[in-house]
C-alpha cells in the first residue's frame, strides 16, 4: 500500500472515530436529558398528585379538612422556601453531587410518606420531599443547560414543558392509583423511578468542579422558610374547634419575628440570599406580591374543587381525576395563548384582564349549589383557571422587569418562591378560615374560602392599577422595545 493510501486510510479511520465519539456523546446527552426530565416529571406530579387523594388520606387518618391542608402546603412551603438556596448549594458542592443527594432525599421521603402511620409523619415526609425538590431541581436545570453547547436553553424549555405535562398528569394518576390501589402508592411509585434517575446520573453525568466562591446564606434560607410555616401553623391552630390560643398567638408572633430577622440578616450578610435592593424596584415588588395573591387563589381552587367533586358530587377518585383534566389543559392553553395577548394589550393589560375577570367568576363559583351538575362544576372552573393562568403568566413576565444579567437568577428564584409560597399560604389561610366554626361563622365553608380568594384577586388588581403609568408592568421584551 502506498504512503498516500495509508495516510488516507488513517485520516478516514480518525474521522469515523471522531464521528462515533460525537454520536456517543450526543446519545449520552439525550439519555441524560430523558432521565433528568423523569425527575422533573416526578417533582411536578407531586405538586398535584395529592389533590385527588386528599379525601382518602383524611379518612385514613381521621382528621378534618383544616389539618389536611398540611399535606399540600408542607411540600410547597419547604420547596419554595429552600429553592433560593438550592442553586447556591449546587455551585458550592457541585451540580452532580447536589442532584444525587436531592434526588435521594426526594425518594427516601417518598418512601416515608407512603409508609406513614399518621398525619404528622406524613407531613414530615412531605417536608423532606420539598427539600429534595429544592436541591435537585436547580441542579438538574443547570446540568441540562450546560449539556448543550449550541442551544443551552432548549433543554430548559423542554424541562418546563415536562413540568406542565406533570401537573396535568398528576390529577389522572392520583385518581387511578387511589381508587385501584391505595393513596400510599402515589408516593411509593416514585421509588423505582427515582432509583433509575440515581443510577443514570451516576453512570452518565461527569463529576463537575465547584464554581461557588461565596458562602451559602443558610440562616436567611431557614428564616425565609420558617416564617410561612409558623404563619400557617398559627392560622390552622386558630381554626381548631378548641384552639390553643397561647400556641396560636405564639406561632403568629414567631412568624413575624422570623420575617423581621430575615430582613436583618439580609441587610448584614455580605452575600444575602435575596439582596433587599432587589425589591427597590416597585414594578417587581408589585408583580411578585400579586403573584402571591393569584397563586393563593389558584391553589385554593384546586383544593376546594377536589373536596367538592368527591364529597358533594360523590365522584370516585378516577372520575374526579378525569374531571380535573380539562382544568389542567386550560392552564396549558393559557400559557400558549397569553404571549399573543401580551403583545396586543401589554403585560399590565393581560395581568389585569386575567385577574379582574377571574375575581367575579370566583364569587359565582362559590355560590354554586352542592347538587349542581358535573358540567356546571367543571366548566366554570375551566374558565376561571384559564383567566387566572393568563394573569399568572403575565405577572411572571413582569417579575423580570429591569433585570440585569447579574440578578436574573435572583429574579426568577424570587418569582418561583412567590408562586409556591403564595399557593401554600392561600390554601392554609383561606381553607382554615372557611372551615373554622369560629372564624367562618355559620356561612358555607366553600363559599367563605372562595370569597376570600376572590377578595385577594381584587386586591392584586388594585395593586397593579395603583402603579403610575410610567411604572406599569412591562415584560423584558417590552422594555427593549
UniProtKB/Swiss-Prot annotation:
<comment type="function">
    <text>Proton-dependent transporter. May mediate the efflux of lincomycin.</text>
</comment>
<feature type="transmembrane region" description="Helical">
    <location>
        <begin position="162"/>
        <end position="182"/>
    </location>
</feature>
<feature type="transmembrane region" description="Helical">
    <location>
        <begin position="127"/>
        <end position="147"/>
    </location>
</feature>
<keyword id="KW-0472">Membrane</keyword>
<feature type="transmembrane region" description="Helical">
    <location>
        <begin position="446"/>
        <end position="466"/>
    </location>
</feature>
<feature type="transmembrane region" description="Helical">
    <location>
        <begin position="215"/>
        <end position="235"/>
    </location>
</feature>
<dbReference type="InterPro" id="IPR011701">
    <property type="entry name" value="MFS"/>
</dbReference>
<feature type="transmembrane region" description="Helical">
    <location>
        <begin position="30"/>
        <end position="50"/>
    </location>
</feature>
<feature type="transmembrane region" description="Helical">
    <location>
        <begin position="67"/>
        <end position="87"/>
    </location>
</feature>
<feature type="transmembrane region" description="Helical">
    <location>
        <begin position="185"/>
        <end position="205"/>
    </location>
</feature>
<feature type="transmembrane region" description="Helical">
    <location>
        <begin position="421"/>
        <end position="441"/>
    </location>
</feature>
<dbReference type="GO" id="GO:0005886">
    <property type="term" value="C:plasma membrane"/>
</dbReference>
<dbReference type="InterPro" id="IPR005829">
    <property type="entry name" value="Sugar_transporter_CS"/>
</dbReference>
<comment type="similarity">
    <text>Belongs to the major facilitator superfamily. TCR/Tet family.</text>
</comment>
<dbReference type="InterPro" id="IPR036259">
    <property type="entry name" value="MFS_trans_sf"/>
</dbReference>
<dbReference type="GO" id="GO:0046677">
    <property type="term" value="P:response to antibiotic"/>
</dbReference>
<feature type="transmembrane region" description="Helical">
    <location>
        <begin position="340"/>
        <end position="360"/>
    </location>
</feature>
<feature type="transmembrane region" description="Helical">
    <location>
        <begin position="99"/>
        <end position="119"/>
    </location>
</feature>
<dbReference type="GO" id="GO:0022857">
    <property type="term" value="F:transmembrane transporter activity"/>
</dbReference>
<feature type="transmembrane region" description="Helical">
    <location>
        <begin position="285"/>
        <end position="305"/>
    </location>
</feature>
<keyword id="KW-0812">Transmembrane</keyword>
<keyword id="KW-0046">Antibiotic resistance</keyword>
<keyword id="KW-1133">Transmembrane helix</keyword>
<keyword id="KW-1003">Cell membrane</keyword>
<feature type="transmembrane region" description="Helical">
    <location>
        <begin position="318"/>
        <end position="338"/>
    </location>
</feature>
<dbReference type="Pfam" id="PF07690">
    <property type="entry name" value="MFS_1"/>
</dbReference>
<protein>
    <recommendedName>
        <fullName>Lincomycin resistance protein</fullName>
    </recommendedName>
</protein>
<keyword id="KW-0813">Transport</keyword>
<dbReference type="InterPro" id="IPR020846">
    <property type="entry name" value="MFS_dom"/>
</dbReference>
<feature type="transmembrane region" description="Helical">
    <location>
        <begin position="374"/>
        <end position="394"/>
    </location>
</feature>
<feature type="transmembrane region" description="Helical">
    <location>
        <begin position="245"/>
        <end position="265"/>
    </location>
</feature>
Amino acid at each position: 500500500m502506498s504512503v498516500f493510501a495509508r495516510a488516507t486510510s488513517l485520516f478516514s479511520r480518525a474521522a469515523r472515530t471522531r464521528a462515533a465519539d460525537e454520536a456517543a456523546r450526543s446519545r449520552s446527552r439525550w439519555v441524560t436529558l430523558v432521565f433528568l426530565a423523569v425527575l422533573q416529571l416526578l417533582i411536578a406530579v407531586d405538586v398535584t398528585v395529592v389533590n385527588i387523594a386528599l379525601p382518602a388520606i383524611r379518612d385514613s387518618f381521621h382528621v378534618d379538612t383544616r389539618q389536611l391542608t398540611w399535606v399540600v402546603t408542607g411540600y410547597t412551603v419547604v420547596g419554595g422556601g429552600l429553592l433560593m438556596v438550592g442553586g447556591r448549594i449546587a455551585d458550592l458542592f457541585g451540580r452532580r453531587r447536589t442532584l444525587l443527594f436531592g434526588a435521594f432525599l426526594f425518594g427516601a421521603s417518598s418512601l416515608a410518606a407512603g409508609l406513614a402511620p399518621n398525619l404528622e409523619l406524613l407531613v414530615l415526609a412531605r417536608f423532606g420531599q420539598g427539600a429534595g425538590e429544592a436541591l435537585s431541581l436547580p441542579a438538574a436545570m443547570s446540568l441540562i443547560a450546560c449539556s448543550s453547547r449550541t442551544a443551552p436553553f432548549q433543554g430548559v424549555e423542554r424541562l418546563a414543558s415536562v413540568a406542565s405535562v406533570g401537573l396535568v398528569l398528576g390529577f389522572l394518576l392520583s385518581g387511578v392509583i387511589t381508587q385501584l390501589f391505595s393513596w400510599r402508592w402515589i408516593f411509593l411509585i416514585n421509588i423505582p423511578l427515582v432509583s433509575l434517575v440515581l443510577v443514570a446520573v451516576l453512570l452518565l453525568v461527569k463529576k463537575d468542579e465547584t464554581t461557588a466562591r461565596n458562602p451559602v446564606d443558610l440562616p436567611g434560607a431557614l428564616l425565609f422558610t420558617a416564617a410561612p410555616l409558623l404563619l400557617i401553623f398559627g392560622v390552622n391552630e386558630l381554626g381548631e374547634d378548641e384552639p390553643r390560643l397561647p400556641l396560636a398567638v405564639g406561632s403568629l408572633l414567631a412568624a413575624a419575628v422570623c420575617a423581621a430577622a430575615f430582613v436583618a440578616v439580609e441587610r448584614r450578610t455580605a452575600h444575602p440570599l435575596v439582596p433587599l435592593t432587589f425589591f427597590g424596584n416597585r414594578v417587581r415588588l408589585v408583580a411578585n406580591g400579586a403573584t402571591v395573591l393569584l397563586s393563593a387563589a389558584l391553589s385554593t381552587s384546586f383544593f376546594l374543587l377536589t373536596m367538592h367533586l368527591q364529597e358533594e358530587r360523590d365522584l370516585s377518585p378516577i372520575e374526579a381525576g378525569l374531571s380535573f383534566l380539562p382544568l389542567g389543559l386550560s392552564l396549558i392553553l393559557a400559557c400558549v395563548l397569553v404571549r399573543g395577548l401580551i403583545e396586543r394589550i401589554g403585560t399590565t393589560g393581560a395581568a389585569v384582564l386575567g385577574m379582574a375577570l377571574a375575581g367575579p367568576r370566583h364569587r359565582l363559583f362559590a355560590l354554586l349549589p352542592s347538587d349542581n351538575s358535573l358540567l356546571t362544576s367543571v366548566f366554570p372552573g375551566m374558565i376561571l383557571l384559564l383567566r387566572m393562568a393568563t394573569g399568572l403568566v403575565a405577572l411572571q413576565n413582569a417579575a423580570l422587569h429591569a433585570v440585569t444579567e447579574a440578578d436574573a437568577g435572583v429574579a426568577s428564584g424570587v418569582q418561583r418562591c412567590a408562586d409556591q409560597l403564595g399557593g401554600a399560604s392561600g390554601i392554609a389561610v383561606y381553607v382554615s378560615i372557611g372551615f373554622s366554626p369560629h372564624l367562618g361563622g355559620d356561612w358555607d365553608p366553600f363559599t367563605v374560602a372562595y370569597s376570600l380568594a376572590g377578595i385577594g384577586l381584587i386586591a392584586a388588581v388594585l395593586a397593579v392599577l395603583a402603579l403610575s403609568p410610567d411604572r406599569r408592568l412591562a415584560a423584558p421584551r417590552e422594555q427593549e422595545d
